[in-house]
C-alpha cells in the first residue's frame, strides 16, 4: 500500500475532533491533527526502531511513511530508488534510437513545453546530446501564438532545417496531426512525456510516458524531466553496451545534471515521494556546487546568497524561468540552462529577472481587477461554486497565476479568461482561459465534459488545473454547464475544508535542533507537506503592515518567549484582520517554520498560514 493510501486508511478509521477546538478559523478552516489516531502507534514504533526523536517519528507517520520505509525516506538515493529504465514502455526503443543518432551524428531537434519542466527537460536532452558532439536545436513554442505542444508548421520547419530525429519533451502524447507531419516527411520522433494519455498514441518511433494506459512501471508521479533523465540513463547504457565509450570517449556526467531534474520536479508540483525525493535531494546537492553556468547566473541575478532549498526552486528560480514563456521569449529558460558561456548566461539571466518583474506588475494589475469583480460575484451569490471572469485587457500568459490567487482567496474553483481583441465591438472572438481548483473538485473532468458537449473550442487538464478555449458567443452556455457540473463537489469540498496541524509549540521550543530535525524528513513539497505547527494562545505583541499586502507580527507566549512571523497577502483578508485586531487578547496562530538570513544574521521565523480566536470557537 502506498503512503497516501495508508494515510487515507488511517484517517478513515476514526473521526477526529477539531484541533484545539478550532471549527472555523480566520480562513474558514476546521483544524485537524495531521497524525490520525490509527497512526500514533506507527509513529512510536518508527521512533523506537530507528532511534529517532518522537517528533520526527510523528512527522513521518503522519505522511504515510511505513516503519520499514524510514531509511529510504531519510536518506533517499538514486541507486536505491530508481528502477531499471526499461520498466517504462518503449524505453528500450527510445534508447536505441538515441544511440543511433549519436553514432550517426544526426541532426536532432528537441521540442519542449514553455514551462519550467519543459525547459529543464529540453536542457537535459540537449546537454546529453552535446556531450556526444551533437548540438541540438531546441524549439519552444510561443505560448500566445502557437500554444501548447507540437504544431504542423513547427514540425515542418524543424524537418526543413535538417532534423533527422525530433525528440518532444513534456508534450507530444496527444499531438497526432503534428507528429504525422514528421512521419510523412520521413523524420523519426521520440515522445518523452508524463501527461495523461488516451488509449490511442501517435504513430512515432517511441512514446516514453509512465501515464500511457499500457505502462505498468508505477512511475506516473514523475515530471517530464524525471522521465527524460531515465531516458538518457538508458541511452547511455545502450551506448556503453555498443562500446561507444573508451579510447578518450567519456561517459556523460549524468548525476551532475540532477540539478535540472530537481528544479523541474519541484516547479511541476509532482509528489515528492519515492524517486522524486531522491531526484530533489541529490539535485539540491548538485545545485549547491554551482556547476550549471545558467543556473548559477540566475541565482546571482536573483540576489540569492543562501544554499538553495525547495522554496528557492519553486518561488525564486522557477518563476524567473517561467517568465520567458509567459510574457517574453519562450525559449530563454531552456537556452539559459544549456549555456557554457558565462557572459551570455549572465545576460539572459538578467533579462529573465527583468521579465519576472514585469510579470509581477502585470499580475498585480490583473489581480486587482479580478478580485474586485470576484468580490461582487461572491457577494451576490456566496454559494457560487465556480468563478468565471475575463477581460480583453488581460495577458494570456498570466491568467493561470491570477486564477490560482482567486482560488486561494475565495476557496472555490476559478476560471480566468483573456479575450482576444477583435476590434469590431461585436462581442465575437475567442478567449483563452486557465482554471484552478480546490481539493475535492475535479476541474479537468468538468472542462473535458464541456468540450465533449461542444461548448468549448478545446479544453482539458487534470483535477487541480485545466485550460480551455471558448468562443465569446458560447460563454454563457459554457458558464452554466461548468457551474452545474462542479456544484455538488464544490459545496462538499468547501464545507469539509480542513487545515492539517502537526503539533503545538511555543517560541521557547523553536531552535536550530528542531529545524534540523524537521529538515531530516524533507525535502518538502507536493505530497510531503512542510510540518505545520500551532502557537496556541499567544498574544500579538507587535504587528505592522509590510508593503501593500503583508502583515508582520511578533508573538509572545505565556512564558514571555517570542517569535517573529509573517502572513503574506493577508491585508484585506480575514487572516490579516485577525492578526491586526486582537485587542491584546490571545489567539492561536498556525504556520511553518523557516530559517531566514538577513544582514549576516540568521533567525527562525514563522510563515503564518492561519489564525483562530479561541473565544469564537464552539
Indicate where each model-derived feature is located.
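Mid-to-C-terminal polyanion-binding domains and interfaces
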Residues: 3-7, 100-107, 344-350, 354-389, ...
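Hydrophobic helix-and-loop "lid/oligomerization" segment in the mid-to-C-terminal part
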Residues: 25-27, 34-163, 185-186, 237-473, ...
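Histidine/acidic-residue-rich, glycine-tolerant segments that coordinate divalent metal ions
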Residues: 169-223
Amino acid at each position: 500500500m502506498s503512503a497516501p493510501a495508508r494515510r487515507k486508511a488511517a484517517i478513515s478509521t476514526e473521526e477526529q475532533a477539531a484541533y484545539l477546538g478550532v471549527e472555523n478559523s480566520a480562513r474558514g478552516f476546521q483544524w485537524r491533527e495531521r497524525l490520525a489516531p490509527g497512526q500514533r502507534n506507527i509513529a512510536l514504533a518508527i521512533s523506537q526502531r530507528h532511534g529517532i526523536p518522537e517528533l520526527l517519528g510523528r512527522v513521518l507517520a503522519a505522511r504515510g511513511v511505513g516503519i520499514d520505509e524510514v531509511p529510504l525516506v531519510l536518506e533517499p538515493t538514486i541507486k536505491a530508488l530508481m528502477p531499471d529504465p526499461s520498466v517504462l514502455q518503449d524505453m528500450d526503443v527510445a534508447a536505441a534510437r538515441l544511440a543511433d543518432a549519436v553514432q550517426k551524428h544526426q541532426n536532432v531537434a528537441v521540442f519542449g513545453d514553455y514551462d519550467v519542466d519543459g525547459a529543464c527537460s529540453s536542457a537535459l536532452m540537449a546537454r546529453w546530446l552535446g556531450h556526444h558532439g551533437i548540438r541540438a536545436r531546441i524549439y519552444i513554442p510561443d505560448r500566445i501564438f502557437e500554444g501548447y505542444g507540437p504544431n504542423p508548421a513547427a514540425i515542418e520547419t524543424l524537418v526543413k532545417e535538417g532534423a533527422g530525429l525530433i525528440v518532444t519533451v513534456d508534450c507530444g502524447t496527444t499531438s497526432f496531426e503534428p507528429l504525422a507531419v514528421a512521419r510523412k516527411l520521413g523524420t523519426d520522433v521520440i515522445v518523452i512525456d508524463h501527461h495523461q494519455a488516451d488509449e490511442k498514441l501517435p504513430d512515432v518511433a517511441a512514446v516514453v510516458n509512465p501515464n500511457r494506459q499500457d505502462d505498468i512501471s508505477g512511475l506516473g508521479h514523475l515530471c517530464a524531466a524525471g522521465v527524460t533523465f531515465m531516458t538518457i540513463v538508458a541511452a547511455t547504457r545502450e551506448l556503453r553496451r555498443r562500446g561507444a565509450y573508451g579510447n578518450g570517449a567519456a561517459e556523460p556526467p549524468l548525476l551532475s545534471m540532477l540539478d535540472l531534474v530537481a528544479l523541474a520536479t519541484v516547479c511541476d508540483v509532482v509528489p515528492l515521494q519515492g524517486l522524486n525525493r531522491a531526484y530533489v535531494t541529490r539535485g539540491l546537492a548538485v545545485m549547491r556546487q554551482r556547476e550549471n553556468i545558467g543556473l548559477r547566473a540566475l541565482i546571482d541575478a536573483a540576489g540569492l546568497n543562501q544554499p538553495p532549498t525547495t522554496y528557492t526552486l519553486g518561488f525564486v528560480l522557477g518563476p524567473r524561468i517561467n517568465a520567458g514563456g509567459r510574457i517574453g521569449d519562450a525559449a530563454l529558460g531552456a537556452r539559459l540552462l544549456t549555456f557554457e558561456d558565462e557572459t551570455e548566461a549572465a545576460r539572459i539571466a538578467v533579462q529573465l529577472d527583468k521579465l519576472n518583474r514585469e510579470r509581477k506588475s502585470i499580475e498585480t494589475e490583473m489581480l486587482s481587477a479580478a478580485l474586485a469583480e470576484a468580490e461582487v460575484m461572491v457577494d451576490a451569490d456566496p454559494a457560487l461554486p465556480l468563478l468565471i471572469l475575463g477581460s480583453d485587457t488581460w495577458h494570456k500568459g498570466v491568467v493561470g497565476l491570477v486564477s490560482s490567487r482567486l482560488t486561494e482567496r475565495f476557496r472555490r474553483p476559478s476560471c480566468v479568461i483573456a479575450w482576444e481583441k477583435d476590434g469590431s465591438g461585436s462581442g465575437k472572438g475567442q478567449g483563452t482561459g486557465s482554471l484552478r481548483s480546490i481539493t475535492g473538485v475535479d476541474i479537468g473532468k468538468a472542462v473535458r465534459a464541456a468540450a465533449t458537449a461542444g461548448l468549448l473550442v478545446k479544453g482539458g487538464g487534470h483535477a487541480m488545473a485545466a485550460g480551455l478555449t471558448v468562443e465569446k458567443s458560447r460563454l454563457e452556455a459554457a458558464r452554466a454547464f461548468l457551474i452545474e457540473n462542479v456544484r455538488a463537489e464544490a459545496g462538499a469540498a468547501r464545507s469539509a475544508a480542513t487545515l492539517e496541524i502537526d503539533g503545538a509549540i511555543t517560541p521557547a521550543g523553536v531552535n536550530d535542533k528542531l529545524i534540523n530535525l524537521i529538515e531530516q524528513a524533507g525535502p518538502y513539497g507536493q505530497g510531503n507537506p512542510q510540518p505545520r505547527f500551532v502557537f496556541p494562545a499567544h498574544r500579538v505583541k507587535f504587528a505592522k503592515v509590510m508593503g501593500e499586502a503583508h502583515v508582520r507580527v511578533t508573538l509572545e507566549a505565556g512564558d514571555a518567549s517570542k517569535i517573529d512571523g509573517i502572513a503574506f497577502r493577508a491585508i484585506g483578508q480575514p487572516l490579516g484582520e485577525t492578526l491586526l485586531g486582537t485587542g491584546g487578547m490571545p489567539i492561536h496562530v498556525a504556520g511553518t517554520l523557516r530559517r531566514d538570513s538577513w544582514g549576516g544574521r540568521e533567525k527562525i521565523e514563522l510563515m503564518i498560514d492561519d489564525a483562530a480566536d479561541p473565544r469564537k470557537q464552539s
